[in-house]
Structures are given as C-alpha cells and as structure tokens.
C-alpha cells in the first residue's frame, strides 16, 4: 500500500509498504530516500509516536495514510 511521510519542511515522501512491515522498516525506507538515520527519526500518526516494534497494520494504516516525520536531535547539557 502507498503511504506518505511528511517532513517538517512540508516535503512528502511516498513509500510502498506492506501491512506487516514494522515501523523500524518504514524508518529504514525513509533513510534510503532521505539519508536520515532511523535513530534520529520519530514517526507520528494520529497524534501518537509510533513504536519501532509494531507493524503498520497495528496502527490501522491504509493506502493514502500520512505519517509525520519529526527529527530527534541529540543535544548536550546546557
């Protein structure tokens, strides 16, 4: 099924995924297209952060679903 991942810059990345794909696999696909390491990615769907060990089906993703990509940048202490 075809889903979209929307970045904070408004760019939309189209991905063809399987309902059994884990969120970690979706993050790997985003890395292939955008070069962002999965460890820095946070995927949000329906207002909730998606867990790496769950699959697309468990979040009720359908063709045309839009995920939001937020970057989790590691910072030092202030």
From Swiss-Prot:
Domain of life: Eukaryota
Keywords: Ubl conjugation pathway
Signal peptide (residue range): none
Entry-linked CDD domains: Ubl_NEDD8
BP terms from Gene Ontology: modification-dependent protein catabolic process; protein neddylation; regulation of proteolysis
Gene3D superfamilies assigned to the protein according to its UniProt record, in alphabetical order: Phosphatidylinositol 3-kinase Catalytic Subunit, Chain A, domain 1
Family matches, as InterPro entries: Nedd8-like, Ubiquitin-like_dom, Ubiquitin-like_domsf, Ubiquitin_CS, Ubiquitin_dom, Ubiquitin_ubiquitin-like
Record-level GO cellular component terms: cytoplasm; cytosol; nucleus; SCF ubiquitin ligase complex
GO terms for MF: protein tag activity; ubiquitin protein ligase binding
PROSITE patterns: UBIQUITIN_1, UBIQUITIN_2
Name of one Pfam family that matches: ubiquitin
Family according to the record: Belongs to the ubiquitin family.
Name of this protein: Ubiquitin-like protein 1
Gene, per the UniProt record: ubl1
């Amino acid at each position: 099924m075809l889903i979209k991942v929307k970045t904070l810059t408004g760019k939309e990345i189209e991905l063809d995924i399987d309902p059994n794909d884990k969120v970690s696999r979706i993050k790997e696909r985003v890395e292939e297209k955008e070069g962002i390491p999965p460890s820095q990615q946070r995927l949000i769907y329906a207002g909730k952060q998606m867990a790496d060990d769950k699959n697309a089906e468990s979040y009720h993703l359908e063709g045309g679903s839009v995920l939001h990509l937020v970057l989790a940048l590691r910072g030092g202490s202030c």
